[in-house]
Every structure is written in C-alpha cells, then in structure tokens.
C-alpha cells in the first residue's frame, strides 16, 4: 500500500495511518476487485458513468474505483456524475467543489424530479419508486451523451440482501438487484461493484476519510418504508447471530434450482429413474 500523499490519488489524501484503516481499505479494494472480475464488468476501452449521490456508499465506490485505477487494475475511463434532483435544502455546491478539489472528471446536472414526484405520488405513499425511475432515466441519457458504456451504482451487500427479502416478503419472488445487468434498451450495462462490500465498511471508510456526506432527506423522512422494516429485521438477526448477513449473502451465490419449486428453472416433469 502506498503511504505518501504524493504517490496516491487525491481522494486518499489525509487517510488515517492506523492499522485498522489500512485493513479496511485493503478489504474494500479486494472485495470490489473480486466482484468486478467475478461478474465480468471490464470491457476493453470502456467508459463508466460513476453515480455520486453524496452518500457514504457512493463516496466509497468512487474512491475504491480510483484506487483500483491508480494501481493499474481497472483499465477503464471514469466519469463521476451527480444528478441534483431539486430536493429542498440540497447543498448544490458540495459535490462540484469536492470533485474539483479531488481532480475527478465529472458532470453535475440539475433536473427537478422532486416536484414531479411530489405532484404525482399520493400523500402517504412511498416516493422511492417514482424517484428512482426518473433518476434512472436521466442517468441513462447522460451516459449516452457522454459516450459511456456502463452506469455504475453504489449499492452494497446489505442493499442486495434487503431487496431480496423485500421481494420475498412483499413480491412473492426470489430476486434481488444483480451486480450486472443490461438496461431495457439493451445499450448500457449497469454495474454494482460494491456488491460484496458491507454497508458498515462503507460507513467506516467514508467517515474515516471525512468526506462531505449529504443525507437523503427525501427518502429518510418517510416512516414505515418496507426497506427500513426489512433492515431492522436483518439487524436483529445479525445481533442475535453475528455473521448471519454474510451467510445469507453466500446463499445468493449458491442456489440449487432442483431444490426449489420453479418449473421454469428445473424440469421436474422430465425427471426419470435409472
């Protein structure tokens, strides 16, 4: 690991010199690299649109990708992107100033999706679905305009687990957000390189680095969201049985269609005795 500030990317200037932080940084790099390689995210001459919301997860994503690129382990071009959605009180200057200071190529765009969401969604209903759909549409458009082949998101292991249980409890299906997919139009990849990284590690890293975290008041102000309920359940399981989250995550990589009930995945009718 490089220790001198003139030998590392500006995103890591001022990094703690503690053994604990070095282990955390090494773990983040290893887990992210493993996910990138495992799910085949690297294309020749690729350009990635790295989405930056200002939350702890997206800061971690940006820093770790630049760490990999700095080491010569990520041969792609990176363009950071923040979509200012017009939320009241959003500190519009924080991210542009941060990215300029960190010498990170970026694009910041203002689109007032907040007003659309508040106008279209009945009072008391969850805002997240429409907000996410509008944001995704703009990010895809920006990626095309910038000549990017992939939109890169900061979802981590815990997001993936929570989505799995939301689909299980409320959607009646076994599914979650995949680490890699192709959009409906078929012209862009969507990557989640932090798929193997825990939320706790993202929090520890961004806090230790002192990045200017921007809270999502639009989502966080809503009580009783399904995701928050599932998060509380998972936290309870983890407290009673430490390591439970990682065991469940491993299960998502170790499915056995023959031991489930989906006839689209396994031909039960075609089973024959010898």
Curated annotation (Swiss-Prot):
Cofactor binding note of this UniProt entry: Binds 1 [4Fe-4S] cluster per subunit. The cluster is chelated by three Cys residues, the fourth Fe has a free coordination site that may bind a sulfur atom transferred from the persulfide of IscS.
A Pfam family it matches: ATP_bind_3
EC number(s) on file: 2.8.1.-
A cellular-component GO term for this protein: cytoplasm
Cofactor(s) the protein requires to work: Mg(2+); [4Fe-4S] cluster
Top enzyme class: transferase
Parts forming coiled coils: none
CDD domains membership: TtcA-like
Pathway stated in the Swiss-Prot or TrEMBL entry: tRNA modification
Compartments in which it is found: Cytoplasm
Gene3D superfamilies, per the entry: HUPs
Chain sites annotated for binding [4Fe-4S] cluster: 128, 131, 219
Motif stretch (PP-loop motif): 53-58
InterPro entries in the record: Rossmann-like_a/b/a_fold, TilS/TtcA_N, tRNA_Cyd_32_2_STrfase, tRNA_thiolation_TtcA_Ctu1
Keywords, sorted A to Z: 4Fe-4S, ATP-binding, Cytoplasm, Iron, Iron-sulfur, Magnesium, Metal-binding, Nucleotide-binding, RNA-binding, Transferase, tRNA processing, tRNA-binding
Entry superkingdom: Bacteria
Main location: cytoplasm
UniProt family annotation: Belongs to the TtcA family.
Described purpose of this protein according to its UniProt entry: Catalyzes the ATP-dependent 2-thiolation of cytidine in position 32 of tRNA, to form 2-thiocytidine (s(2)C32). The sulfur atoms are provided by the cysteine/cysteine desulfurase (IscS) system.
Subunit record text: Homodimer.
Note: The thiolation reaction likely consists of two steps: a first activation step by ATP to form an adenylated intermediate of the target base of tRNA, and a second nucleophilic substitution step of the sulfur (S) atom supplied by the hydrosulfide attached to the Fe-S cluster.
Protein name in UniProt: tRNA-cytidine(32) 2-sulfurtransferase
Organism annotation: Roseobacter denitrificans (strain ATCC 33942 / OCh 114)
Lineage: Bacteria, Pseudomonadati, Pseudomonadota, Alphaproteobacteria, Rhodobacterales
